[in-house]
A protein has these predicted regions:
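The feature encodes the CheY-like receiver
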Residues: 13, 32, 58
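Short amphipathic alpha-helix used as the core "switch/output" element in two-component signaling
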Residues: 41, 63-75
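Acidic catalytic/metal-coordinating carboxylates
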Residues: 35-38, 59-65
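Recognition helix of helix-turn-helix DNA-binding domains
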Residues: 155-190
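Short hydrophobic/Thr-rich beta-strand motif most characteristic of the beta2 strand and flanking loop
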Residues: 26-34, 42, 185
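Active-site residues of response regulator receiver
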Residues: 54, 82
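Active-site beta3 strand of CheY-like receiver
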Residues: 46-52
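Short, flexible helix-to-coil linker/hinge segments that flank and couple to helix-turn-helix
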Residues: 88-147, 200
Length: 201
């Protein structure tokens, strides 16, 4: 029996995925999470074989959850199921130790098979995303530039970003300028859009 935690912030989608997977005799859904922080907590407490998670969720992204599980040396394997087929997300997922990456439009039997394969220690990647990632540019941003851009993308001021990241407003301005230059962006809004479109945020 494969023990599974499902993390998805849209209640209807969470219910649909859980209902489909409940039909599989060898899959046991031991927990459901509505955001990234809850997903991380359940994964650490329940130690399922597989955490099935979306990427973009409140509090922590699925990529952040995967990275924290890897940092904690957790044996929980992570399978990302998302609407975002961005090559940058796939690269970050692989760097975070994710075992699988599928799009939400995958067939139910393909999803169940991917869970089994990831639980067995194999890697499963949607072929379309893998092909796109092979030719996509590498992420030029540092972790700090990405964190600053992420908060700028939420509409926060330099002062608010500085408070959140323990940086001075001048340092925030420098990180935004460096990120903008790397991305060829005229301003912070354009830099955020470019980074988001590539899956780097």
């Amino acid at each position: 029996m494969i023990r599974l935690v499902i993390a998805e912030d849209q209640a209807l989608v969470l219910g649909a995925i859980a209902s489909l997977l409940a039909l599989e005799a060898d899959l046991d859904i031991v927990g459901r999470a509505a955001d990234g922080a809850e997903a991380l907590d359940l994964a650490l407490k329940l130690a399922p074989d597989v955490l099935l998670t979306d990427i973009e969720m409140p509090h922590l992204s699925g990529l952040d959850v995967a990275a924290q599980l890897m940092a904690a040396q957790s044996p929980v394997k992570v399978l990302i199921v998302t609407t975002f087929g961005r090559a940058g997300y796939l690269r970050r997922a692989i760097d975070a130790g994710v075992g699988g990456y599928l799009l939400k439009d995958s067939q139910a039997d393909r999803l169940a098979d991917a869970i089994r394969r990831v639980a067995a220690g194999l890697r499963v990647i949607d072929p379309e995303i893998a092909a796109a990632a092979a030719f996509a540019p590498a992420d030029p941003l540092t972790d700090r530039e990405r964190a600053v851009l992420r908060l700028a993308d939420e509409g926060r001021s330099n002062k608010e970003i500085g408070r959140a990241l323990s940086l001075s407003p001048g340092t925030v301005r420098n990180y935004l300028a460096e990120a903008g230059a790397k991305l060829g962006a005229a301003n912070r809004i354009e830099a955020s859009r470019i980074a988001r479109d590539h899956g780097w945020l």
